[in-house]
């Protein structure tokens, strides 16, 4: 698919995308488009961005051959793109640096952000501390409770964290409140959106900043495969979890021209795709407008957004980036669901076979890779985008496992077993 050129000048990916915003934000969006058009290919901007990725984030992120997991599962060889090793512990920092650089060039001293799992909020707080910008992070009250370590990290970094009590008190509601803030502080505020969602140019801009993931993989994989005597120069499949979809788009986009590589996005199937308790917008949603763009949305017959569920705060969102909707429509990417329990099992499996604690978001991608590998040959390969580390999720996993996270006196001297045992 060498002719892939998306979006168009108006930000459309086929019938998806575009910009559906209030009149108050029209000028701010226009200014952002102009600024990004000016700097996206500017040598000085790109050099600074690359320098920050190398010296502040620690890129390039390595690719790791999960050899023990591959042997235990059987079938294809599994490789992990280690975004969890980035500074702040996830892929989110890649995009935040690019947008913060734009904010400085546009003269915006105040930054706002939404966050679900807290990783985008931590990344925003981190770069604002580095650049001397005011930072306000909106986070659903439910997510504040289940991701409390990241809340404290944001506060340590100087950010103001605003719990959102409206709606389902999750990522959707945090994004709503951030949009309201932007409307009332449009002159001095830059909104750093964390995913490939929102009005144009955000889906394109976030994708471009995150594409460093896939670009590195294309350079790294030939040597990895040759070292393990695997077939081909690139993986047979690339797998990433999809909520809004920024980590997935970051690894997918550079691979779009590689026809021999399947692109597989993994949505949160929650308690099951037929349960009504999930966040699988592409599999169970329908076209609609959410947060400024047309995409696939979980909505009822009257167009009202329905409640979502996922064990993973970062995937608990009723929409998806418009480019994912387009890639599904044209058949270049496929999207599947993984349940809460399957993600938990994969979380424990990776901990015990590789010594890596993955984020619950990333665990969804790992779970599908483990399933898929069994159907493939040993000389074939799967590349998983391990989008973040799981430190933030240990409390959630401990609660679900019946473990005593704080190891109170009653648990001293006792072994604590995980849910998968």
From Swiss-Prot:
Quaternary structure and interacting proteins, as annotated: Tetramer of two alpha and two beta chains.
Any one cellular-component term (Gene Ontology): cytoplasm
Cofactor: pyridoxal 5'-phosphate
Role: The beta subunit is responsible for the synthesis of L-tryptophan from indole and L-serine.
Enzyme Commission (EC) number: 4.2.1.20
GO molecular function: tryptophan synthase activity
This protein's pathway: Amino-acid biosynthesis; L-tryptophan biosynthesis; L-tryptophan from chorismate: step 5/5
Keywords: Amino-acid biosynthesis, Aromatic amino acid biosynthesis, Lyase, Pyridoxal phosphate, Tryptophan biosynthesis
N6-(pyridoxal phosphate)lysine: modified positions: 92
Name used for this protein in its record: Tryptophan synthase beta chain
SUPFAM superfamilies with a match to the protein in the record: Tryptophan synthase beta subunit-like PLP-dependent enzymes (SSF53686)
Catalytic activity: (1S,2R)-1-C-(indol-3-yl)glycerol 3-phosphate + L-serine = D-glyceraldehyde 3-phosphate + L-tryptophan + H2O
HAMAP family: Trp_synth_beta
Protein family per UniProt: Belongs to the TrpB family.
Organism: Verminephrobacter eiseniae (strain EF01-2)
PROSITE patterns found in the cross-reference section: TRP_SYNTHASE_BETA
């Amino acid at each position: 698919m060498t002719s892939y050129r998306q979006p168009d000048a108006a930000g459309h990916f086929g019938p998806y995308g575009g910009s559906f915003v209030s009149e108050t934000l029209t000028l701010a969006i226009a200014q952002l488009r102009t600024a990004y058009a000016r700097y996206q290919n500017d040598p000085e901007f790109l050099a600074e961005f690359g320098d920050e990725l190398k010296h502040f984030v620690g890129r390039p992120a390595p690719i790791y051959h999960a050899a023990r997991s591959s042997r235990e599962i059987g079938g294809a060889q599994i490789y992990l793109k280690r975004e969890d090793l980035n500074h702040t512990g996830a892929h989110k920092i890649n995009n935040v640096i690019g947008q913060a650089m734009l904010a400085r060039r546009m003269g915006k001293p105040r930054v706002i952000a939404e966050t679900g799992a807290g990783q985008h909020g931590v990344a925003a707080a981190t770069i604002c501390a580095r650049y001397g910008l005011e930072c306000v992070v909106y986070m659903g009250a439910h997510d504040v409770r289940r991701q409390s370590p990241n809340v404290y990290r944001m506060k340590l970094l100087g950010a103001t964290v605003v719990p959102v009590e409206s709606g389902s008190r999750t990522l959707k509601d945090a994004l709503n409140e951030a949009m309201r803030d932007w409307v009332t502080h449009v002159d001095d505020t830059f909104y750093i959106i964390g995913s490939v969602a929102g009005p144009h140019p955000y889906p394109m801009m976030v994708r471009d900043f995150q594409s460093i993931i896939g670009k590195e993989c294309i350079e790294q994989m030939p040597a990895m495969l040759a070292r393990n005597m695997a077939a081909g120069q690139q993986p047979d499949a690339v797998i990433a979890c999809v909520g809004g979809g920024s980590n997935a788009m970051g690894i997918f986009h550079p691979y779009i021209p590689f026809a021999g590589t399947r692109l597989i996005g993994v949505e949160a199937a929650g308690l099951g795709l037929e349960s009504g308790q999930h966040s699988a917008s592409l599999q169970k949603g329908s076209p609609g407008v959410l947060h400024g763009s047309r995409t696939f949305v979980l909505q009822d017959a009257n167009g009202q957004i329905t409640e979502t569920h996922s064990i993973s705060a970062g995937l608990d969102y009723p929409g998806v980036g418009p480019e994912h909707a387009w890639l599904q429509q044209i058949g270049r990417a496929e999207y599947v669901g993984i349940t809460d329990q399957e993600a938990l099992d994969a979380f424990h499996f990776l901990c015990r076979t590789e010594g890596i604690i993955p984020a619950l978001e990333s665990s969804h991608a790992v779970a599908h890779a483990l399933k898929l590998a069994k159907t493939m040959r040993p000389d074939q390969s799967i590349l998983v985008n391990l989008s973040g580390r799981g430190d933030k999720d240990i409390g959630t996993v401990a609660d679900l496992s019946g473990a005593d996270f704080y190891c109170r006196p009653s648990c001293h001297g006792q072994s604590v077993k995980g849910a998968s045992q």
